[in-house]
Structures are given as C-alpha cells and as structure tokens.
C-alpha cells in the first residue's frame, strides 16, 4: 500500500487527509487537457516518483496546438485529439470522449486544464469519478478568468481547488484546496504562476486520497 504525498499545503480538506492511502492496484487514469498540460506533467512526475500509485492510460486533448500532447509523447502516454469543432453539439463531442475513455478502461477522469463545459453524457458515464482543478478558492471566482477576477476584486488570498465535477461550471463537492497570497505588485501572469505551483502539489495528492471510497462519500455528504 502506497502513502499519499505529505499533506503540507494549507487549507487541505480534512475529510481527504483522514483517508490518505492509495489502493493496492494502480489506478487507471484518463487525463483531459486543452492547453499547456503542466498538471499532466505533475501527475506523471508524481507517479514516477512513487508518490501516486496510478497509470495514465490516455490523454485526450481538444486543441490541436495543445502542448499537453507533446508532454504526453515525452512520457510515452497515448494522446488522442478530439477537436470540439468537428462535432455538431456538445453531446456528440462527449460521446466520443466517453468511447475513448471506456476503450482504455479508465477508472478516474482527471480534467487538468480542460476548457470545455461537459454534458450529462460524460457525467453519467463516470458518476463521481471525474475531478477538476480550478485556479481559485471555489466557490469564489468561477470561470475562465479566475485569476483576473481575484486581482480585480482586491482579495488578499486566492488559491486553487480540486473538486468533483458537476453539471454546473466549477461546482461540485470540494475535495482539496491550497491558499496563495496575492502580492501588491502581482499581475495575472505572476499570480497564476504561483497558483500553478500549488496546483501541481495538490492535484496528485487529491487523486491519491480519492482512492478511498470513504473520502469521496464524506466530501459529497458534507457539501452544502
């Protein structure tokens, strides 16, 4: 049995920390990304370092220029382009994604910078088995410009959140969070870079902890 990484980041959900043991068999992950793929890299590195007992079976990306595909190739992970522009609606798009994930026998779906809204087609295929990471302390600052929203609001602390996916954008039970201070001279770029450092820490930790079904149940039950 493999222990999860040390839980040293502030504001980590106690319901997750109490169940921080990984399973006896490697978890089969399917990762979805739209851009740079730095969170994909963090997960792959955590697996290599023995911090996460899992296997990345496939990367699905929707943007032909996504650097995440290059990262997947570097790690020897199959990557499949599913361009949303090729589908008449979101349901058809999600059907193709579900087919790929099922073909690879995926147990958990990790949205690591996935920039598309999902439909019940995907959610129903993997109920309570999809997690997302977002660059704010949800429920504050939802959407694609969370970092800019935090700066505009003048908050002194922001951060990142790992949560179970739901149909509503950037909602669903919160699993793990990490706080990041907002500095007086921060720009969207500098703040986002510091948030990503914490994303790269807590996403592998959350994946590892979620191997406990009790942790999932606790997170769902305690959600307002």
Positions of the model-derived regions?
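An anion-binding loop in the catalytic cleft
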Residues: 2-26, 51, 184, 197-224
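N-terminal Rossmann-like dinucleotide-binding module
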Residues: 2-67
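Donor/substrate-binding cores of folate-linked one-carbon enzymes
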Residues: 46, 112-221
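Short, surface-exposed acidic-centric catalytic microdomains
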Residues: 52-96
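Conserved acidic residues
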Residues: 57, 107, 128
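N-terminal glycine-rich "phosphate-gripper" loop used for MgATP/nucleotide binding
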Residues: 61-62, 85-86, 90-91, 104-120
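Short, well-structured alpha-helical segments in soluble
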Residues: 95-103
């Amino acid at each position: 049995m493999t222990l999860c990484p040390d839980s040293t980041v502030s504001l980590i959900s106690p319901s997750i920390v109490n169940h921080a043991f990984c399973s006896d068999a490697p978890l089969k992950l399917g990762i979805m990304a739209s851009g740079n793929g730095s969170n994909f890299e963090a997960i792959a590195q955590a697996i290599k370092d023995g911090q996460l007992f899992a296997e990345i079976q496939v990367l699905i990306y929707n943007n032909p220029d996504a650097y995440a595909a290059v990262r997947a190739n570097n790690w020897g992970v199959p990557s499949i382009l599913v361009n949303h522009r090729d589908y008449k609606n979101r349901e058809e798009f999600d059907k193709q994604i579900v087919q790929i994930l099922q073909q690879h026998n995926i147990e958990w779906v990790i949205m690591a910078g996935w920039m598309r809204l999902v439909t019940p087609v995907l959610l129903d295929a993997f109920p309570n088995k999809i997690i997302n990471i977002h660059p704010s302390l949800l429920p504050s600052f939802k959407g694609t410009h969370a970092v800019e929203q935090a700066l505009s609001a003048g908050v002194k602390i922001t951060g990142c959140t790992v949560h179970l996916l739901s149909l509503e954008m950037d909602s669903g039970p919160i699993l793990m969070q990490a706080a990041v201070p907002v500095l007086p001279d921060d720009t969207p770029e500098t703040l986002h870079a510091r948030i990503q450092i914490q994303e790269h820490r807590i996403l592998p930790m959350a994946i590892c902890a979620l191997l406990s079904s009790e942790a999932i149940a606790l997170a769902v039950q305690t959600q307002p």
